[in-house]
Amino acid sequence: MSSSANFFVTGTDTEVGKTLVSGALIFKLRESGFNTVGFKPVVAGTYLDVNGVKQNEDLETLRIASGLEPQQISLCPYVLDVPAAPHLMAQNESVHLDCGVMLEAKNDLHKQFNSLVIEGAGGFLVPLNEEDDLADLAQAIDFPVILVVGMRLGCINHALLTCEAIQSRQLTIAGWVANTLSVEMPFLQENIQTLQDRIFAPFLGAIPSLPKALMKPRNAPYSLEALKFAAQHINLPK
């Protein structure tokens, strides 16, 4: 592990475990002595907590992993209310998703923390506005990329296409994680081995399905215990 520990986490799709992996990475980096914080350029989907405060479960997970108090610091410049494609919800809420604003927010955080884990939204090519997509932002940030593969039917094609897209932007793939979704897929280990044979980047580990006691309820972040469980099954990039 180098003295710099900054990563951009993307996934083969939405709901494949990017937040779980991002939180686990933050936990492991902080355990290794880094002053690490999580960041998301945009989120879509909010709920009201028991105190009537608007929250987003992904941001709350990153906050918990980063060891921050509620409302201590902003981890995202754009918080949209409806859980749908960010560019569509931004249009619906009359918001322009500006990559410059996202980069400025990221840079402000980087002045306070020596290690950033940036979690993307959805997949790698998700549009942000009429001109830019998430890949453009990742290219501008230029952090090594960690790919989360949600292990389900079709994931091999999705993973290999995403790797091609990442490499076409001249970005380094620091590693990839196999995340077992709630129902284990048939031939799970064989699928993981196929991906290991075809993805020319380090395999960081496979996260099994979370035990029932650690599964998060709807409209809630992952618990620190769930992040610790996931962290036990992955390695940090070297």
Predicted feature locations:
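Charged helix-capping and loop-helix junction motifs
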Residues: 129-136, 160-163, 188-193
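N-terminal phosphate/diphosphate-binding loop that engages ATP/GTP or pyrophosphate donors
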Residues: 4-6, 20-96, 100, 107-108
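Conserved glycine(s) of the Walker
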Residues: 16-17
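Hydrophobic anchor at the beta1->P-loop junction of P-loop NTPases
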Residues: 9
